[in-house]
Amino acid sequence: MHRRRFLAGVAGLGAFGVAGCIDDTSAGAPGGTDPTDGVSTPTGTDGPGTPTATPLRTPTMTATPPETPPHDAPFPPGREDVDRVVWYREVSDPAGTTHLSYSTSSLSLPGEISLTLQNNADRQFMTNFYDWALYRWEGGRWRHVAPLFVNQPLMTLEPGESHTWTVTLGDENLETPAFRASGTHEVTVEPVGGGHYAFAVDGWWEDQDETPAHEHEAVYAARFEVEGPQLPLVPSSAVTATRREGDTVVVEAENPRGSDGTPATYVLTRDDAAPGPRELVTEQVYREWPLREALAHADGASEVRVETTTGITPLFGVHEEDNPAVTYDGETFRIGAEEREG
């Protein structure tokens, strides 16, 4: 199975709100070996519980997909509080219209793009400069990529003023265990693959007629193309060992957020009948740990067990009463969690 396609996304201009500060850097650090250099990692192929050395999988790198989003595609996904979406391509009078512009309509990986929100109205625009959003077009719809967590101050853009985000996109450092994208000016989002993307910000106008105002938001968006290979899904440097026990793959990993926590096992079980799975793309998977490790080892396995630690309650944030499940590359898996002895 070519681990590139779908996994279920989080919609909205900022998936989760948090009260604390979030910095502009990625969590975790690049490390480990390049997955294409032939270095081996312990894994089990000779029998149950027998670790052997096998080469790391070398993913197939393909070109930027030709699929182009139609102009009438629903956007942003999952937002019922949006009254109006203003695309930069639809602005005929930039000098007289509030809009989000870009420095380029296309870039190559790794690359940089600047996006500027210009308030050309005569009143304040109420917004949050942390609450930008990057979307990827894949599988016939827009999918939210970043950020997953958003600081929640209320900010304003005064009449005649502008605000610029400089966004760096990359496809390197794939073995970094955890990725975080945040910031109000300088933003890095990695890893991403080639394709069509959209950057968006939202807010509402001071003294607008609709009330409550925050339930009648305007979204300003710009679409651009990223040229580069498709993103492969590979394990991170947090993985210390793997072994195979029949149809089950066991992955041992160090939690990139620290080892202080409850010893636990993240369980991914193949189940095509699982109800209501989230459908994700690879760019989203890299931002969900340890799901990323489990899916990277799911080829040919009925179950993947990631043995690590977690500081989250419930374990790994898994609410098993909700029967969580994901779909990736056309295959569906149930998600579970078990406490284990340290």
Residue ranges and their predicted role:
Residues 1-342:
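Terminal disorder- and signal-encoded targeting elements
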